[in-house]
């Protein structure tokens, strides 16, 4: 695999994570409305984890330029 291909994959993963993060937050709101507080909290934590993963993926992209 080339460096450019790997960069492309990382960019894709960041975008993909963001799509899932947004969806998880939407579903957390729905769970809250249904009175499923424990489910909502865990969905929010999952969304937070995806945000953290994306942060590290962005750091990996920056590392290509170092």
Label each region the model flagged.
Residues 1-30:
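N-terminal acidic leader/helix
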Residues 30-63:
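Short, charge-rich amphipathic interface segments used for partner binding and complex assembly
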């Amino acid at each position: 695999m080339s460096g450019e291909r790997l960069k492309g994959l990382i960019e894709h993963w960041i975008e993909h994570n963001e799509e899932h993060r947004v969806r998880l937050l939407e579903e957390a709101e729905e769970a809250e409305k249904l009175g499923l507080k424990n489910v909502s909290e865990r969905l929010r934590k999952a969304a937070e984890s995806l945000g953290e993963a994306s942060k590290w993926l962005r750091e990996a992209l920056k590392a290509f330029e170092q």
